[in-house]
Design a protein with these regions (language model features):
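A short, N-terminal "cap"/entry segment at the start of jelly-roll beta-barrel domains
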Residues: 1-62
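Residues at beta-strand starts and edge strands
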Residues: 47, 73-75, 91, 128-129
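Residue-level recognition of well-ordered beta-strand positions that form the cores
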Residues: 52, 78-80, 96, 133-136
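A short beta-loop-beta micro-motif enriched in histidine and acidic residues
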Residues: 60-75, 88-90
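Short, flexible loop/turn elements at secondary-structure junctions
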Residues: 73, 81, 114-116
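A short beta-strand-loop-beta hairpin characteristic of the jelly-roll/cupin
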Residues: 80-105
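Conserved metal-binding segment of the jelly-roll/cupin
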Residues: 100-123
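A short hydrophobic beta-strand segment most commonly corresponding to one strand
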Residues: 119, 125-142
Length: 142
């Protein structure tokens, strides 16, 4: 598709046959769409990046990853899509970091240092589309 020498470093589709362990949670097709996923299996040497759209729904969120740690730093981000107020997340997120509950209803970045227990991460309410982005320095997330 790309003719340039470095075109092999451009990803336009999510990782195929992504295997998620039991502790990793699951994404409901009714409430989310994983649009991109990158790790060292997709491009050798790449680090972990994931992009997911979450859609408004009345469906209860049961997809949260269990509490876990990584040997690398991670950034978890959620972005609101209201053009008139980009800080309005259009959702309420419950994110546990080191056992402490954080209720967040505005666009945010959460830096999770290596070795810190994080999750569960629950979407308690969602009224507008929300874009989720996560990146970590590890070569694979799962």
């Amino acid at each position: 598709m790309f003719t340039q020498k470095l075109g092999k470093y451009i990803v336009t589709n999510p990782k195929q046959n992504l295997v998620v362990p039991e502790w990793g949670g699951s994404l409901s097709a009714e409430r989310s769409t994983r649009t991109m996923y990158l790790d060292s299996e997709v491009i050798p040497g790449a680090f972990y990046v994931e992009c997911v759209w979450f859609w408004p729904t009345e469906q209860k969120d049961t997809s949260s990853p269990e509490p876990h740690t990584h040997e690398w730093d991670e950034v978890i981000a959620f972005f609101g899509t209201d053009r008139n107020d980009l800080h309005d997340l259009g959702a309420e997120i419950e994110l546990y970091i080191d056992g402490e509950q954080n209720l967040i209803n505005e666009t945010f970045l959460a830096f999770i240092p290596a070795g810190i227990v994080h999750c569960p991460l629950n979407i308690l309410k969602i009224t507008k589309p929300v874009f989720h982005f996560a990146v970590g320095q590890g070569k694979k997330y799962f």
